[in-house]
């Protein structure tokens, strides 16, 4: 037993440890310290550690002889990394970013259980670090980032507006029916506030506030980098507030989640021969998968309506490169294009550091650096200015 007996519901982390108790030495663990460490984790962090721990413990159990998981031997971790990187018929090879996360979770569990205070953790051994570096070098894989969804305007003099799928194109694909109003409000809010998908689906009516100039504020009560729940405020444009108001008015929502599933039921035709269609709005917030489905549906509709100009055959690749995170990446690039600095963008969009924001502006910077500006004029005709990279064709 790791956690105090009076705790009514063991955490998912503890349940996994209990299941593989014979592989884990928890004698030096503090029940109070374990409970505090798990309680301090954000839900997404707890879910990731639970999955990573379950994977590692199950692998240790399958070894012959069975390998001790905690404390682990560095050699055990090296074999584990190679097993993950190799893949199998039922499991694709793990990417370098996944391997690093798996090892980080193993290290965290060791610390929670009292290891690493008097001697280095096994995850810090040179052979483990070298194995990670070797796999990363062998695969030569840069971590894939979501393709950006930029607004669709030229953000700086001399720059051409982004091409391809843009926020403006998606908004133009939304009709005035109840589903179109919801989708337009969702797209507009996600872009304006640069929301993570977890922040988007967690938004409630009570979190929205309009101010005198027509703009608004969104209170973000929890986020990935705000595990203490201190909260943050995001600015919303007047256009976004108008779209939110239209959606809330037609939906009749006055409290609870802003964005929910809409069920469509069709019935027999009325006296005029028109088919009866009823919309039922659910009580629960949209899921991450629901947001992605809405985004992809709107992309295809924007293409069909002629709001997006793509090369033939690029539709599938374009849609697959986009995710709910694309709004956040696109806004980051638009702010850089407008001349804002990394520190200000990181603060406004709740990035963990300016370095993270700079990474998402990497491709934009290449299209507007000194070489692009000078050679763009020399090679593309005198006086022409280098164009910013397409918003949708930068598929990473």
What are these regions (language model features)?
Residues 211-302:
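Basic, alpha-helical nucleic-acid-contacting "clamp/cap" segments
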Residues 190-214, 343-344:
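Short, charged phosphate-coordinating catalytic segments
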Residues 349-374:
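Catalytic-site neighborhood detector that most strongly recognizes the C-terminal catalytic loop/helix
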Residues 161-197:
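Basic, Lys/Arg- and aromatic-enriched nucleic-acid-binding interface segment
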Residues 253-254, 292-347, 375:
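Short, basic (Lys/Arg/His-rich) helix/loop patches that form interaction surfaces
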Residues 1-15, 375-396:
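C-terminal secondary-structure termini that scaffold catalytic or DNA-interacting sites
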């Amino acid at each position: 037993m790791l956690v105090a007996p009076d705790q009514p519901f063991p955490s998912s982390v503890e349940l996994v440890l209990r299941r593989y108790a014979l592989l884990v030495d928890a004698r030096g663990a503090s029940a109070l310290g374990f409970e505090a460490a798990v309680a301090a984790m954000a839900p997404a962090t707890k879910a990731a550690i639970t999955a990573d721990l379950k994977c590692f413990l199950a692998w240790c159990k399958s070894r012959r002889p069975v390998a001790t998981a905690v404390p682990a031997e560095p050699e055990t971790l090296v074999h584990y990394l190679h097993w993950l990187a190799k893949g199998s018929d039922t499991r694709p090879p793990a990417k370098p970013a996944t391997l690093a996360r798996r090892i980080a979770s193993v290290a965290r569990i060791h610390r929670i259980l009292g290891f690493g205070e008097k001697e280095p953790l096994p995850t810090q051994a040179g052979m483990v670090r070298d194995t990670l570096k070797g796999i990363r070098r062998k695969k030569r894989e840069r971590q894939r980032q979501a393709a950006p969804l930029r607004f669709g305007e030229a953000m700086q003099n001399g720059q051409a507006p982004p091409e391809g799928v843009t926020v403006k194109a998606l908004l133009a694909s939304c009709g005035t029916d109840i589903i179109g109003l919801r989708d337009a409000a969702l797209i507009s809010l996600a872009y304006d506030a640069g929301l993570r998908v977890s922040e988007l689906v967690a938004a409630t009516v009570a979190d929205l506030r309009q101010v005198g100039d027509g703009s608004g504020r969104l209170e973000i009560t929890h986020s990935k980098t705000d595990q203490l729940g201190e909260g943050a405020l995001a600015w919303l444009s007047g256009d976004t507030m108008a779209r939110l108001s239209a959606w809330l008015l037609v939906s009749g929502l006055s409290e609870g989640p802003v964005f929910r599933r809409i069920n469509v039921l069709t019935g027999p035709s009325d006296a005029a021969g028109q088919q009866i269609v009823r919309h039922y709005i659910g009580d629960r917030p949209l899921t991450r998968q629901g947001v992605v489905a809405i985004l992809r549906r709107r992309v295809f509709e924007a293409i069909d309506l002629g709001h997006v100009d793509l090369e033939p055959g690029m539709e599938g690749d374009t849609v697959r490169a986009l995710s709910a995170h694309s709004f956040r990446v696109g806004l980051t690039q638009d702010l850089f294009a407008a001349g804002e600095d990394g520190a200000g963008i990181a603060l406004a969009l709740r990035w963990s550091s300016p370095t993270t924001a700079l990474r998402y502006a990497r491709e934009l910077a290449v299209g507007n650096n000194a070489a692009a500006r000078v050679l763009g004029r020399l090679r593309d005709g005198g006086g022409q200015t280098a164009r910013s990279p397409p918003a949708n064709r930068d598929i990473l």
